[in-house]
């Protein structure tokens, strides 16, 4: 992930968007799809997303499209990533309702597909708990000297989701060891 933030700090253009989506959206999606069949009943999957992916930065139309895609299927979420990439290529991402932030859009996509996969696993009766979370702003190389949490503090929410009793909740977004608005 530190590689991705380094890319994002290089500016904002089609190349930055492509590399960011490849890492955060498509990379995480592919890893999730490969690992999911290996997870036994009662297992858990936790995707580390970000509060940067919250939907409050989008037009109502795009926000609703994300919410609908998260209830539909992975191709619907992937189509939103393509729509963002196309809008950036045309220089119209803000007119199209997206923020001018590749990292934020990639993390919104990651949270959305995590919700879809959780919904699908639940329909299949797999007995899995699948959630996305934000570790917070952690003092790592990725934060380039910033960050307010230690790595141990940043790990608290993902570890909680992986190991502790979360009341059977799946398909949610979490931050600071609690369910959070997406």
Protein language model features and the residues they cover:
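Catalytic loop of short-chain dehydrogenase/reductase
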Residues: 2-18, 41-123, 134, 145
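Conserved residues in the N-terminal Rossmann fold of short-chain dehydrogenase/reductase
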Residues: 22
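C-terminal helical subdomain
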Residues: 30, 132-140, 144-182
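Hydrophobic positions on the long internal alpha-helix
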Residues: 31-35, 39, 113-114, 161
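Short conserved AdoMet
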Residues: 39-41, 166
């Amino acid at each position: 992930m530190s590689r991705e933030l380094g890319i994002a700090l290089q500016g904002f253009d089609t190349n930055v968007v492509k590399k960011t989506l490849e890492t955060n959206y498509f990379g995480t999606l592919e890893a999730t799809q490969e690992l999911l069949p290996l997870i036994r009943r009662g297992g858990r999957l936790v995707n580390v997303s970000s509060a940067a992916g919250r939907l409050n930065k989008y037009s109502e139309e795009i926000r609703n499209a994300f919410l609908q895609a998260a209830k539909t299927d992975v191709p619907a979420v992937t189509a939103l990533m393509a729509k963002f990439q196309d809008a950036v290529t045309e220089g119209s991402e803000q007119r199209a309702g997206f923020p001018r932030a590749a990292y934020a859009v990639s993390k919104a996509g990651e949270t959305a597909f995590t919700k879809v996969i959780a919904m699908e696993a639940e329909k299949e009766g797999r007995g899995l708990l699948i959630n996305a979370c934000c570790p917070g702003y952690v003092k790592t190389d990725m934060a380039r000297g910033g960050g307010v949490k230690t790595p141990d503090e940043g790990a608290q929410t993902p570890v909680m989701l992986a190991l502790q009793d979360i009341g059977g909740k799946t398909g949610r977004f979490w931050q600071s060891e609690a369910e959070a608005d997406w």
